[in-house]
Amino acid sequence: MARIAGVNLPAQKHVWVGLQSIYGIGRTRSKKLCESAGVTSTTKIRDLSEPEIERLRAEVGKYVVEGDLRREIGIAIKRLMDLGCYRGLRHRRGLPLRGQRTRTNARTRKGPRKAIRK
């Protein structure tokens, strides 16, 4: 089991799929990382040699991933809330940000229905 960016990658999966278990790396970026590190993307993680793992670590290190990315996103949201702009207010109230309707739907963002007292 290889450890990259503080994440244990699942040994039985292909490299490009396993890299996606790192927060901030999706399909496209994982394939590009494999290409730039010179690793075949369909190789299983358990079959990687130590130099290949080191090259992948170096390539992943060039990006903001995991805790640093989560922190950056949190800071950006906090900044919006402190500014008092529309998006910040929507974050604060736990409502959708991008113009979706809220009279019906938006249950994921708003949470479960609250019972109305009579």
From Swiss-Prot:
InterPro entries: Rbsml_uS13_C, Ribosomal_uS13, Ribosomal_uS13-like_H2TH, Ribosomal_uS13_bac-type, Ribosomal_uS13_CS. It comes from Xanthomonas oryzae pv. oryzae (strain KACC10331 / KXO85). It holds the Pfam family Ribosomal_S13. Part of the 30S ribosomal subunit. Forms a loose heterodimer with protein S19. Forms two bridges to the 50S subunit in the 70S ribosome. Keywords: Ribonucleoprotein, Ribosomal protein, RNA-binding, rRNA-binding, tRNA-binding. Located at the top of the head of the 30S subunit, it contacts several helices of the 16S rRNA. In the 70S ribosome it contacts the 23S rRNA (bridge B1a) and protein L5 of the 50S subunit (bridge B1b), connecting the 2 subunits; these bridges are implicated in subunit movement. Contacts the tRNAs in the A and P-sites. Residues 94-118 are annotated as: Disordered. This is Small ribosomal subunit protein uS13. The keyword Ion transport does not apply. Gene3D superfamilies: 1.10.8.50, 30s ribosomal protein s13, domain 2. NCBIfam families: uS13_bact. Belongs to the universal ribosomal protein uS13 family. SUPFAM superfamilies: S13-like H2TH domain. The gene is rpsM. It comes from the Bacteria. Disulfide bonds: none annotated. GO terms for biological process: translation. GO terms for cellular component: cytosol; small ribosomal subunit. One of its GO terms (molecular function) is rRNA binding. PROSITE patterns: RIBOSOMAL_S13_1, RIBOSOMAL_S13_2.
